[in-house]
């Protein structure tokens, strides 16, 4: 009875989730290297339009946040992310062929829509696989995507622009998303009950633990749908929203503009 429970889920769930999140991060911020790497001059983009092109992504990003989470709960997060990977791969490749700034704006908006459900879906999927005593560590691994994505995007983008040009940056990273799509589809499953690759002892452990936790939550505090008005009146939630707003503003403001600032200050290329 004291035999260690197999940890297959850590590799088969966390690894593809983390890789997919890293690719999504790279695809959303690679424009920060493309703009000073030749895109601005080739397309005649002003600083104001560059800001719009960077920011319009986040308008599209809003649309699938809540629907994505609901799909993961009631449907298949695996299929949702697979379609998302396919969509943003196509959009990224298409961005490599733009000839006008308004084409860029449209594609950046669509990219935001296609990536919008990513984080709610993967965090919901993780909750289907890890009991409460493991969920904190599992989520911490997933949230490593931002620093890891930043570490990878800068040297990879610089190398591609230096060796080829900014158009190939979008094309190559779009093709990389298709590779990740294949890995995602082959490795991951929505729930322990559906995973043929899962050892039986690990499956029994997960189903027993997760079912017991759900039953305990259901008996302690039955969940009901709160009116939208009540959600916005929740002061604790609004403080968290405001805190995250300022964090994301500073984080992405820094990430999206730092390459341009460094080029203007130093006159260096993007390699």
Residue ranges of model-derived segments:
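Extracytoplasmic
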Residues: 12-50, 68, 118, 254-259
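Residue-level signature of mid-helix packing/kink "hotspots" within the transmembrane helices
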Residues: 29, 58-66, 116, 150-151
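Extracytoplasmic gate region of multi-pass secondary transporters
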Residues: 32-33, 229-271
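Interfacial helix-cap and linker-helix signal at transmembrane-aqueous boundaries
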Residues: 39-40, 71-72, 156-164, 262-263
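Helix-breaking motifs and short loop linkers at transmembrane-helix boundaries and internal kinks
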Residues: 44, 76, 97-103, 114, ...
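Conserved MFS/SLC helix-loop-helix module at the cytosolic interface between two early adjacent transmembrane helices
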Residues: 63-102
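Cytoplasmic helix-loop-helix junction between adjacent transmembrane helices
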Residues: 107-145
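Helix-loop-helix hairpin linking two adjacent transmembrane segments in secondary transporters
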Residues: 142-195
